[in-house]
Amino acid sequence: MNIELFMQQLEARHPGEKEYLQAVHEVLLSIADIYDQHPEWERASLLERLVEPERIITFRVPWVDDKGKVQVNIGYRVQFNSAIGPYKGGLRFHASVNLSILKFLGFEQTFKNALTTLPMGGGKGGSDFSPRGKSDAEIMRFCQSFMTELYRHIGPEVDVPAGDIGVGAREIGYLFGQYKRLTRDFSGVLTGKNLEFGGSLIRPEATGFGGLYFVREMLERAGHDIKGKTVAISGFGNVAWGAATKATQLGAKVVTISGPDGYIYDPDGISGEKIDYMLELRASGNDIVAPYAEEFPGAQFVEGKHPWEVKVDVALPCATQNELDGNDAQHLIDNGVLCVGEISNMGCTPEAIDKFIAHKMLYAPGKAVNAGGVATSGLEMSQNAMHLSWSAEDVDKRLHQIMHGIHRQCVEHGTEADGYVNYVRGANVAGFMKVAKAMMAQGVV
């Protein structure tokens, strides 16, 4: 496979879509040698089909603000790949949303979902609408307008959206209510729902919980115990909250969280009421972490910087894509970090990843580490289909088993001759093989 030529052709077809092209290139680097061993894949143009979404739905979303003025946003749903199940992936409401970001997320989601072993294809959607600064009534009207178009493209056996950045339980509730109103159908068409109407226990914290289960497996395989380790976390939303909660439960000490305004360093550890306060910060809608240092005087707020300059044992990006760059990676390496686990999607830049792998560090990508969120969404789908509700202990046990299985697949496909586990290659190859076999079995569709 000529990766450079393939990427040139793809970029000519999709100019300017940097996030999407970055995600494709990263996977190609991992699977090129395996692809070359299967001439039947090349004859079937498997790769050319795999990197293109099956369907992209774009639509306008008109809604009325509290002043009576009509606002118009753009809505998207990228139905990327359904080879192993109905499209599954979140909805993101944020001003930065564009087609490149959603295509990258849908592409990554395809392999992430394959790693869970659950029957879920890959998809992603959202809008350039930001809930920040909007009233509940405005958010409700936007969600209702968004679903008025989206409903005709989704269903429990077709496409099952969930939440993501800017889409929490409130937004999922408004979206589900409008879907039910339009279709007169009460089904598991969305995940991340409230418990009162079909949600699953553990779902809000599942991405963070699953990430820590995976990181613990990484450390244990390398002869380390997570207990007593210091942890840097970025972000302060559901993912960061879940990660901080589970890290503390496992005996680690979380010392940072962050927001758009900077980061908090708390040498005493972020636990107990401090973790609860993260929820208050998020609920305030201000999208800042500085008030944490006022609430807990022992902590320090560092304005305009990322937490990767802090000396820690474990670094967990939990905020957004490309939040940890090459310079940040060098800071972590110089400070002797043991392990980096992406809990955000594509949280590290290619330069950062190259540095981690060159130093033979414990590093694992988001498609493996953060798969706990979509895995628990899959468990929510199962509960909805059976009209059952499992206990928190049962869901957590299943989540733990799934993350153990993902780690095992990464080790199986990513172990190099010297014993180093390249988790990037392992995750990409394991996910790709399952999707590739399914696509070949289903013909040219």
Model region roles, listed by residue range:
Residues 94, 113-227:
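Glycine/serine-rich phosphate-binding loop and adjoining beta1-alpha1 elements at the start
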Residues 1, 15, 19-22, 26, ...:
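Conserved active-site and cofactor/substrate-binding residues in soluble primary-metabolism enzymes
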Residues 262-363, 368:
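Rossmann-like adenosine-cofactor binding region
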Residues 191-194, 199-311:
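Glycine-rich phosphate/diphosphate-binding loop of Rossmann-like nucleotide-binding domains
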Residues 2-23, 218, 331-445:
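Adenosine-phosphate binding glycine-rich loop
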Residues 40-71:
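Structured beta-strand/loop patches that form or line metal/cofactor-binding pockets in enzymes
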Residues 21, 37-44, 117, 154-163, ...:
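Flexible, glycine/charged-enriched surface loops at secondary-structure junctions
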